[in-house]
Each structure stands twice: as structure tokens, then as C-alpha cells.
Amino acid sequence: MKLKQRVVLLAILLVIFIFTKVFLIDNLDTSAANREDQRAFHRMMTGLRVELVPKLDHTLQSPWEIAAQWVVPREVYPEETPELGAIMHAMATKKIIKADVGYKGTQLKALLILEGGQKVVFKPKRYSRDYVVEGEPYAGYDRHNAEVAAFHLDRILGFRRAPLVVGRYVNLRTEVKPVATEQLLSTFLTVGNNTCFYGKCYYCRETEPACADGDMMEGSVTLWLPDVWPLQKHRHPWGRTYREGKLARWEYDESYCDAVKKTSPYDSGPRLLDIIDTAVFDYLIGNADRHHYESFQDDEGASMLILLDNAKSFGNPSLDERSILAPLYQCCIIRVSTWNRLNYLKNGVLKSALKSAMAHDPISPVLSDPHLDTVDQRLLNVLATIKQCTDQFGTDTVLVEDRMPLSHL
């Protein structure tokens, strides 16, 4: 081969090498991608659309028993859930046999017991779909539709750490009031021709009730986790102070993650990576209100971070609160599987998947188009943040293999 031909060939090979490196880092590094992640993504997409059907294949088990058996330390529901439609149908239609004020918290909710003894949390509609919540990123009432959308995003991301949620219409006069406790019943009132209630909570006020359209109220129901899995509450290391003029340490100390890594349960095990997964999840939905989080009790840091209470989300599609990503850009680590999944979802796939997943919900359309568009844009921002980390520290440091011992972080 002549020298000139060799030079041309080497130049071509060099261009191919450089292109391959750039392409792989931007579109899935081979060290990050694996066939199982690809198969998992395709399985998720195949089973994405959930039709609410009453029929269960397991005729000897109730939907509540099946959902309870799904729960394990690292997931609330399994990857493949052929019974999901039947369980969500039961959540949306089963007779309410008791209604009470919600469990502890700052926002209005009701605790319902459905036929068969299953507890669910009911969050009422407070805003129309196109209402924009102004102010701080954690401002406003809970958004019931945000709970529904967040659950389906949890499915799409492959986390499987959020309790099941579905939209539901309830008749306050015929379904709730006849079975309501005195404590809940005492908070009912009529505004114009609409039945309303204000419940019992830190911010609940008689002057700020949630009102039905006549007697019919739209809301979301969240499946209560089984009692055999008691929860333990933790202060989120990247929580806000909620005090004007007072910053949390992470808001001014760029080396804050180093301090977090030295404290339990973030010094070993999966919890820190769960925190970072959650930061990505919260950023996509616009949730800046995760000041605490729950895991299962007595887990020694091994159980998942459970994605509860996602209703302070999807408030303002024009607001991008980048500080939600602080765990990601301060620690500059993320699971390989999360990185892979995020890459599979770009180029409009996330918006399409989320819209498809929610299409059969009883309160569909769950989100307005501006919110769906924003989720796609926020995904690009997450990927850009990860790329900044890989540019600075290298992919081998930033992308953490899920099965790798985590004590090195």
C-alpha cells in the first residue's frame, strides 16, 4: 500500500474513532449500555398503556392481595404487571366503605377505605389543567393530577418506587358523606351549589375548601402500602430551609456532597444513588418540595427511597428550578441504568410515552400540553448536566454500574 493511501486510511480510521467516541458518550457509552437495559426499556414500552379492566386472571386473589405481594425492599411493583389494569380499575371504582380525615401532613387529603379493606389516599382537584402556579417552586395546593403523572413517570423511568395512583371521580353526597367519620363530616360545607370540604391538616382552612362540581369531585387515589412494610421518615440531605434569607448548606457549599458521603446511610449502599435518581425524577416533574423522604423501617440503608407525595409537581411549565438537580451536579454520579433509560427517552420519546401511559386514566387528559413539552426539555437539561460531569471527571467515575459495590463512592 502506498504511503498516501496509508495516510488516507489512517485519517479515515481516526475520524471514525473520534466520531464513535463522541457518538457513544452522547448516545450511550458502550460501557454504560447493556443489552438487559435495552430489553427492559422495550418491555416497558410494550406494556406502557394500561387499560383499566375489571377482570383478574387470579380469581382466588383480590386486587389488593396481588398489589401487596408485589412490594419488596427495592420496588413497589414488578417490572411486568399484567394485573395492573385490574388493580387500578378497582382503585377507581370499588365502593367506599369508610372515609376519614387524611393522615398527618400539611395538605388537604382524605383517607378512604375501599371494599375489601384497602386504604387509599384521596387528593381532591384544586386547579384546572391549564392553571399556572406562580411564586416559589413549592407554592400552591397539592395537584391531584401530578400524583397520577408522577406514578406513570416512575414506571417509564424504570424506578418502580412510587405507590400506585389513579384518577377517580367520587360523589361526595352519595359515596363519601354517608360513610364519613364525624371528624371529616364536620368539615363539609356548601358553596353555591357545590359540595365542599376542607379536612384536617396543617394548612387546612374553612375559608379554603376543595369544592366538587355539584356533588361530583375529581381527584386521585394512591394505594396505601401494606402494613407489613412500615415506613421510616428521613430528612432529605438536600432539603430546603423554607425560611426567607436562610440558605441550606448545600445551597452555598459546592463540596457539600463530600460531607454527605461520610454520613450514614449515604456512605455505603444504594441510598445516595437513590437520592440522585430522585433528583432527576423531581426535576422532570418540577417538584422542589421533597424536604423529607421515606424508606422501609430497619433497612440499614438497603431499601429504596420511596417516591411518596409527588403532588407539588407540574405547577408551572415555564419554571425550571435547576437547584432540584443539586445532588446530581454536586456529586456527579448516576446509575448506569438511569443514564441508559434517560438516553432512550430523548428525542420526544418521553413526552409520547407519558401521554400514552396516562391515556386511559379516568381523569384523562392528565396533563396539559405545555407540561408534556416541558418534561421533554427538562430531560435534555438533565442529560446536559450529566455530560458536564463526564467532561470534568470522566464516564468511568460518573456512571456507576448498578451491581458495583457502592462503598467506593
Curated annotation (Swiss-Prot):
The keyword Transmembrane applies. Disruption phenotype: Embryos show severe stunting and increased mortality at 13.5 dpc. It is found in: Golgi apparatus membrane. The keyword Transmembrane applies. Disulfide bonds join 196-211, 201-204, 257-331, 332-389. The active site is at residue 289. Signal peptide: none annotated. GO terms for cellular component: collagen-containing extracellular matrix; cytoplasm; Golgi apparatus; Golgi membrane; nucleoplasm. Its EC number is 2.7.1.-. ATP binds at residues 107, 123, 222-225, 294, 309. Little expression detected in the secretory stage enamel. Weak to moderate expression is observed in the gingivae and odontoblasts. Strong expression in maturation stage ameloblasts. Glycans are attached at residue 193. It comes from the Eukaryota. Residues 26-409 are lumenal. Belongs to the FAM20 family. This is Glycosaminoglycan xylosylkinase. The lineage of its organism: Eukaryota, Metazoa, Chordata, Craniata, Vertebrata.
